[in-house]
């Protein structure tokens, strides 16, 4: 899977896209990719990437799949890389931890930035410094 991830990141990067997330379902027969670029993506981007990657994966004989889905990450996109937390500073996010801090594993707050190996998250007016190594899942949580 790391080889596939590296192949996809490299190929998408050459096209000007970022691989936000990848899901494998149906025992790896479905590859679902979430892509983005700074100005956002539309259906034409999804079609372009789908065609490009279908051709690329056809050449890679060791990648066995039946279906490829390309999608935008959505308004509640996942946050995985340090650069995601920097890019979306000032936005509201839901963060789930591996190990509790002050008895809590789930936090909803405003992303305030990154301090070396820590995410700075403001919850109820109090800043929490959360080690990136302790983050299980994080995603934007926009208010409507």
Curated annotation (Swiss-Prot):
Disulfide pairings: none
Q: Which InterPro entries match?
A: Ribosome_maturation_RimP, RimP_C, RimP_C_sf, RimP_N, RimP_N_sf
Task: Quote a single Gene Ontology cellular component term.
Answer: cytosol
Task: Name the UniProt key words of this record, in alphabetical order.
Answer: Cytoplasm, Ribosome biogenesis
**SUPFAM superfamilies annotated for this entry?**
YhbC-like, C-terminal domain, YhbC-like, N-terminal domain
Gene3D superfamilies, per the entry: Ribosome maturation factor RimP, C-terminal domain, RimP-like superfamily, N-terminal
Q: What is its main location?
A: cytoplasm
Q: Where in the cell is it found?
A: Cytoplasm
The superkingdom listed in its UniProt entry is: Bacteria
Pfam families recorded: DUF150_C, RimP_N
Q: Please explain the role this protein plays, according to its UniProt record.
A: Required for maturation of 30S ribosomal subunits.
This protein's name:
Ribosome maturation factor RimP
The record lists the organism as: Methylobacillus flagellatus (strain ATCC 51484 / DSM 6875 / VKM B-1610 / KT)
């Amino acid at each position: 899977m790391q080889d596939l991830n590296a192949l996809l990141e490299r190929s998408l990067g050459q096209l000007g896209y970022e691989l936000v997330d990848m899901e494998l379902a149906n025992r790896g027969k479905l590859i679902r990719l979430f892509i983005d670029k700074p100005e956002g993506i539309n259906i034409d981007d999804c079609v372009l990437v789908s065609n490009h990657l279908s051709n690329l994966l056809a050449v890679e004989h060791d990648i066995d799949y039946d279906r490829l889905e390309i999608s935008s990450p959505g308004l509640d996109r996942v946050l995985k890389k340090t650069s995601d937390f920097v890019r979306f500073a000032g936005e509201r996010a839901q963060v789930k931890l591996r190990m509790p801090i002050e008895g809590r594993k789930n936090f909803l707050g405003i992303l305030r930035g990154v301090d070396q190996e820590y995410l700075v998250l403001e919850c109820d007016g109090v800043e929490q410094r959360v080690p990136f190594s302790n983050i299980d899942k994080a995603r934007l949580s926009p208010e409507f």
